[in-house]
Amino acid sequence: DSFYAVMKFFTILYELSRCEGARSLSSSPFARVETHSDSRRIQMIQQYINQNYKQDIRLGVVSQMAGMSPVAFSRFFKTRTGKSLSEYIIDVRLGYAANLLIDTNNTVADICYDCGFNNLSNFNRIFKKKKNCSPKEFRENFRRKKKII
């Protein structure tokens, strides 16, 4: 009986993976998967960003933490992560924002500012560009899918 339940579960997961309109609801930085980088500098900076994403994070401060010039650090970070520092920070903030949109009833504006963005229209524009929908649509889509399941 439990074997068939597990098989049914895997069948459902398989069908969902093949769904044409499937979209990811969470970005990889939010998943907080341990970094594959062997660099202590990168790990230290990623930890700093995850702990301080609500604050203004400056390249000069972060590069100083890593003991590098801003130009050298930018090159080093992009080589190791595949993203610029600002892209990485935005992805982390969007991950937290997506989580808050799903788990809370906070307004989009509150979530925007709680996640370190300082401009609501900029937040909406970036969110739509990265997630292919507005924050409001993201929340509505998730809640609609949650009711179906």
Where are these regions (language model features)?
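An amphipathic alpha-helical interaction segment
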Residues: D1-S37
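Two-component histidine phosphotransfer core
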Residues: F3, M7-F10, K54, F76, ...
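Basic/polar phosphate-binding segments, predominantly the helix-turn-helix DNA-binding elements
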Residues: S28-H36, Y48-L94, C112-N141
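Pre-recognition alpha-helix immediately N-terminal to the DNA-recognition helix
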Residues: R41-Y48, G95-N99
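Residue at a beta-strand N-cap/secondary-structure junction
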Residues: D56, N105-N106
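Intrinsically disordered, low-complexity basic tails/linkers immediately adjacent to helix-turn-helix/homeobox/MYB/SANT
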Residues: K145-I149
